[in-house]
A protein has these predicted regions:
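Juxtamembrane helix-loop-helix connectors linking adjacent transmembrane helices
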Residues: 25-37, 60-126, 144, 212-213
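N-terminal hydrophobic targeting signals that begin at the initiator methionine
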Residues: 1-2, 217
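Structural signal for the C-terminal ends of transmembrane alpha-helices
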Residues: 50-60, 187-191
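Alpha-helical transmembrane segments in multi-pass membrane proteins
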Residues: 2-56
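Transmembrane helix-loop-helix hairpins at the membrane interface
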Residues: 17-18, 86, 111-217
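Residue-level signature of transmembrane alpha-helical entry/exit and packing/kink sites
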Residues: 4-9, 35-39, 69, 73-77, ...
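Alpha-helical transmembrane segments and their lipid-water interface positions
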Residues: 49, 92-93, 208
């Protein structure tokens, strides 16, 4: 494993937790400016991964599933959105009610404090960053390191779920984020189209910001 890949794995695995740790120093009710800065740092993780791939590993962007979109990209994104947003809740909603309701309610209460435009920013950028870290980079590099694509994908999916524990709690992370991660991973392995995953993931979050989270104030 090269130093560049080791750095990329560190960014993908520890970066989100580092941003959460920074947010703790901002207090319980940070200003919108502080939250914008924190989100910019979070987005910087994806930029760092792209720079590592291009200039550190000297690999093409399609080594993490990032390539020019086609009509198939849009159809894949649409199908993934339907599966994740409309069908998956039949599985996850009962699990959340049984194991992750407290975490869900606490997380939604925090999001409800935010203005609508900032929720759009969080949703639109959040899906892009998470897909870059967990699907594009971690799946591909862990698969290469282990020599088994299924193992790399499994480890990346577990990492995705665990990354949500500090904010949403263990119950919600296992009941909702883990199944969502499995679906996103299956689609990535099937089509290996990172942009399709980004579109579906970000769209789902943005819509959920207004259909699940109540209006501020």
């Amino acid at each position: 494993m090269s130093r560049a890949t080791a750095l990329g794995l560190l960014v993908a695995l520890a970066g989100p937790d580092a941003v959460i740790l920074l947010s703790r120093f901002a207090g319980e009710n940070p200003s919108i400016v502080v939250q914008l800065v924190l989100q910019a740092i979070f987005c910087g993780l994806a930029v760092a991964i792209l720079l590592i791939v291009r200039y550190g590993e000297r690999l093409p962007m399609d080594s993490i599933g990032l390539r020019m979109p086609t009509r198939a990209t849009l159809s894949t994104a649409a199908l993934l959105f339907v599966v994740g947003f409309f069908l998956l809740p039949f599985v996850t909603d009962p699990l959340v009610r049984a194991f992750g309701l407290d975490g869900a309610q606490a997380g939604i209460a925090e999001l409800a404090k935010l203005p609508g435009w900032f929720r759009v920013v969080l949703g639109a950028t959040g899906g892009v960053v998470e897909e870059t870290l967990y699907r594009g980079y971690l799946i591909e590099r862990l698969a290469a390191l282990t020599g088994r694509r299924w193992l790399g994908a499994s480890l990346a999916t577990v990492a995705f779920a665990l990354a949500h524990v500090p904010t949403w709690g263990v119950g919600f992370a296992l009941a909702a984020d883990l199944p969502a991660g499995i679906v996103l991973t299956v689609f990535y392995l099937w089509r290996r189209d990172l942009i399709a995953n980004m579109l579906a993931h970000s769209t789902s979050i943005v819509i959920a910001m207004f259909t699940i989270v109540p209006a501020a104030g």
